[in-house]
Amino acid sequence: MKALTTFIAIALLAFSTTACSQQHTYRSGGFGSKTVKASKNYVTKDIKVDNFTKLSVAGSPDVTYTQKSGKPTVEVYTSDNIVDLLDIRVKDNTLYIGFKKNVSVSYNKLEVRVSAEKLNGIAVAGSGDVELKNGLKTDDIKISVAGSGDISGNNISCTDLDISIAGSGDINSSNITCNDLQVSVAGSGDMKLNNVTANFTRASVAGSGTAILSGSTQEAEYSVAGSGDLFASDFVAKKASASVAGSGDIKCHATDFLKVRTSGSGSVGYKGNPELDYPKKGLYKLCLLYTSDAADE
């Protein structure tokens, strides 16, 4: 009986912890304002907005973007006493999604569904999540996470793609086609880009984060500063350069030429049979069976 009681107590504690993990608290401004606790009555509200080509998300909402022609749309699903505390507006061609100033709220669910014909920028500041619902076709686009938020979406076709993480957030995407790809991870975040086709790629990791790339590129420049890792052994490049400063690692694949420079205890592993320009230490050849997915595990 005592064992059963202990088991029930642990189960209730686990349930309580899970429930609490779904609770979001957001404060804009000072700490003097009273916290508004979300009701259990959920509503859907349409918000009229002007045309925009960039998206900026603050706080911790769940945002889904759908690319479609016609007028832009914004639909909010949340508690009825929370919806009017939101600040959703377009300024300088950017759709801002957040809360009004001097607001303190506690809520479980906040979904914002957005559609527009064109998008050239996505910025998440905080713990919010953004999902590209049906892919994205555009010219140049900049995608960034600052904080612990996440961005996900597949089937991106563009001219130039600048994608970055500053903090502990994550970015995941598959099926990317672009001319110029700029990848940056600063902090402890993780970025995973699968099935990429690019002409030129520059990827850097600063801190303890991880970047994983697969696909192909004509030319690549890789750099790691700190203890982070850059896994590109499944990202085939004709020409590549790899530089490590610190204890981090780079794993890459080059077919024609590979230049390597290391300082510290870091190293560079490679696939392929390229012409090599490398120092006496810090370079080793990967086995043919090695994959970035194995490194991710």
Residue ranges and their predicted role:
Residues 5-10, 15, 19-83, 94-117, ...:
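Short acidic/polar N-terminal linker immediately downstream of export determinants
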Residues 45-46, 53-65, 111-114, 118-289:
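Extended, compositionally simple hydrophobic/Ser/Thr-rich segments
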